[in-house]
Amino acid sequence: MIIDLIWIITSYVIGSIPFGVLFANIFCGIDPRTLGSGNVGATNITRICGRKLGFITLFFDVLKGFFPVVIATYLSESPFMYTMTGLAAIIGHLYSCFLHFKGGKAVATSIGVLIPIAFWQLLFAAILCTFFIWRSGFVSLGSLVLVTSLPIILFITGKFAYIPLSLIIMALIFWSHKQNIQRLIKGEEKVWKHSESI
């Protein structure tokens, strides 16, 4: 129990690591919080530093969700433990202790959390996400489709233990995308790499 609690706290710290800020400072000499959308995620890093660094940021943001949950599967056989570990990493990205409790939008980190425990369900949701991005041009809309469809897919496929996690993720992602949603409603959202999502 103590080990589980320590790992959940550690997962929050791992999730808090602002790779976008670190990479942009090291390789571009800039603070992404002051340029583009001001977001610390891969989408804004792509915008201000290029696709290569954006992809690297995306990889590490996914990894900081993936790694804690994988370790949790070795520490415990409880889906509740995986849920708490994953949420800790996601909340770390959203409210980083290294960025005065501010952060990114947590789409990439949420994907990382789900890969070890709901891979096929996530893959199907990602296909829907990609389709909507391709058809609409809005990365933010695709992200919202992904997190909205996931609880339904989990229910259909009988992965009931992770439905609560998926619903919490959906709520967090909608909250972190509230400005994007307002722009979508007003028809002011930017398309493709200019969108603020990941």
Curated annotation (Swiss-Prot):
Topology in the lipid bilayer: Multi-pass membrane protein
Its EC number(s): 2.3.1.275
Enzyme superclass (EC): transferase
Swiss-Prot/TrEMBL GO biological process terms: phospholipid biosynthetic process
Pathway per the UniProt entry: Lipid metabolism; phospholipid metabolism
Superkingdom, taxonomy of origin: Bacteria
Main location: membrane
Pfam families in UniProt: G3P_acyltransf
Reaction(s) catalysed (UniProt annotation): an acyl phosphate + sn-glycerol 3-phosphate = a 1-acyl-sn-glycero-3-phosphate + phosphate
Gene Ontology MF terms: acyl-phosphate glycerol-3-phosphate acyltransferase activity
Keywords, sorted A to Z: Cell membrane, Lipid biosynthesis, Lipid metabolism, Membrane, Phospholipid biosynthesis, Phospholipid metabolism, Transferase, Transmembrane, Transmembrane helix
Record NCBIfam families: glycerol-3-phosphate 1-O-acyltransferase PlsY
HAMAP family the record matches: PlsY
Record function comment: Catalyzes the transfer of an acyl group from acyl-phosphate (acyl-PO(4)) to glycerol-3-phosphate (G3P) to form lysophosphatidic acid (LPA). This enzyme utilizes acyl-phosphate as fatty acyl donor, but not acyl-CoA or acyl-ACP.
Similarity comment: Belongs to the PlsY family.
Name listed for the protein in its UniProt record: Glycerol-3-phosphate acyltransferase
